[in-house]
C-alpha cells in the first residue's frame, strides 16, 4: 500500500465525485456545465443557474444502450436523493434521444459535446439546483451507472484517500440556526479562525476534520480539537449557545482551557466497516458482533 495517502478536500470530493467518500477507481467525474445553460431555452436549467445554483453532468461513456428499466432505476435513485426527476441524453449517430433534446440549441449541444467529450453511444445525465444537493444526486447516479456497467468487476485496486477540510458549520433550515457539522469542539482551519472569532459565519468555514476512505467506503474519521478558551467560546456563540448555557454545560472545559491545554485530536476507525470490506459483505449488519435489534436477536 503506497504511502502517504493522497488528500482531497471535502469540496473537491463533492464537486468531482458527488460524495464525501469518493470512489475514484473509475472516471465519470462530475462536470459543471452551468455556463452553457445561463440563457437556455430549457427553463429548468436556466432557472437553476439564475437562482444561484448549478447544472452538473456526467458522461457514462458507451452506456447509451441503457435499457428503459435501467433509466427508470437511475431516475428512482435521483428522486430518492431529492431530485424532481432525471434529465438524460442517449447519444445516437442520427440524433440525441432525450426528453430535453428539443429544448437545446445547436450551440448548447456543441458546447456540451466539447465539455463532456460526448461521442456516439454515450449516456449523459444531469442534475440541477443548489450546488451540494445537485452534486449528491449525481454522485449517487454515477455509482449506480458504474454498477450497471460493471466498471469495477474484478478490480483489486486499493484506493486509500484522506478527505479533509469538511465544513465547520451548516445552516439548519428547520431550527433556523447554525449547527456543528462534526461536533462543537472541532477546530477550524487556521485561515478561518479569525472569521469564527469575529462571528463571520458561513457554510464556507472549514474544519480540521478528516475521514480516511478506501474504495468509496469511509473507514474512520476524526478531527483536531479546539484547545483555547476564546476560540471555544466563539464556537459556542456561533451555535447559539449563550454564555450562561456554556458555563452550565461546559464550564469545566472552558476553565481547563484557561489554564492551558495542549493541542490534541484523534481518529476513530470503524472496524466493522473494515471487516465488512474484507468479507465482501453488503452491510455491516452481516459482520457486527453485537445484537442487531432492540431485542438482542439477529
Q: Can you name each region flagged by the protein language model?
A:
Residues 1-298:
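Class II aminoacyl-tRNA synthetase catalytic cores and aaRS-like
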